[in-house]
Amino acid sequence: AAMLGLQNMEVLEETKDGEGIGEVGYLPAATTVTALVVLIKEKFDLKNVILYGNPNDTVEKIAICPGSGKSVINEAVQKKADCLITGDIGHHEGLDANEMGLTILDASHYGLEHIFMHIMYEYLKGYCMDVEIGIADVGVPFSIL
């Protein structure tokens, strides 16, 4: 969310322990889906993002769920998000979300989660001085031909 400059963040789906799954917030200014895709590809170093929706639609309130997003579609709709950025969405769930007025951007699990490896690496280095820590950054595990 921070990488996209989202503001006024809140938890997308609250869990029993007071934490939550995903986040929802606002872009600094409304933009087109196409412009948002360009930003996502730039910030996350991606070649592709799968779109369920209209590339010319305007979006401002954005929900993010880096893992599978199918379980938070209803929450995103209830919180009036214009778009859900997720790491995985099924074909039918993407179509169903569109019918509810929600644009879906599937950036893949790797696409949204690879940045976490470097954050966790630095964290573990600080706490596990006697253990060799490494990163196996193998890249996107699939090809779009």
Language-model features, listed with the residues they occupy:
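Hydrophobic structural segments
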Residues: 1-145
